[in-house]
């Protein structure tokens, strides 16, 4: 390299380099089979997400996915041990559905934080640069992600993924919450747009819920998820 030449690393290359240094980053794909408490009180995301919704969402809906996954895995084990292969397809579908619910909710709680206490604002550092590289600007990304979330048909999620094949960030919709592995991607941020996530406060105004949600996004956690996904 000649003297005086300054080289710069692209944001996505910086992600890969930073990931190599993350010694204990939680790998998203390794979500443990455990039901954890929220990292904040149920009322911590007020006024953007109400306490009653958070309580029901976490203690009832997420808990049901966790319990359903445990049951499905236990039934699959019984089928294999007994040789009753006729039920494997049924319980495999149940396991995929409930695993998706447990997996995405475990991420969902962590990519939120109380406004002004880690939640809201705009991403900076490597994540901010990566978003700008992949979407043109943060505002363009926010507009595209919001549109994807509002437009999900029926129940599902809008998700920001790290695509492993070309190491790019992409926005995808998930109807319901399963079949995530078919995309060759790892979700690093997502919003639940099943009605149970917002109906008590916002009724049928999904767009209002999505717009309010940006005030509690935990960008530091999203960045850590990106580093973990790129390892």
Name what the model sees in each region.
Residues 28-32, 60, 71-168:
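All-alpha RGS (Regulator of G-protein Signaling) helical domain and cognate RGS-like helical scaffolds
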Residues 217-221, 225, 229-231:
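Low-complexity, Gly/Ser/Thr/Pro-rich intrinsically disordered linker/tail segments
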Residues 57-62, 102-105, 178, 196:
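Histidine-centered active-site/metal-ligand motif
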Residues 37-61:
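Short His/Asp/Glu-rich catalytic/ion-coordination signatures at enzyme active sites or charged loops
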Residues 22-42:
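Acidic, low-complexity proline/glycine-rich segments
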Residues 1-16:
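N-terminal export signals
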Residues 147-203, 211-220:
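An amphipathic alpha-helical core segment
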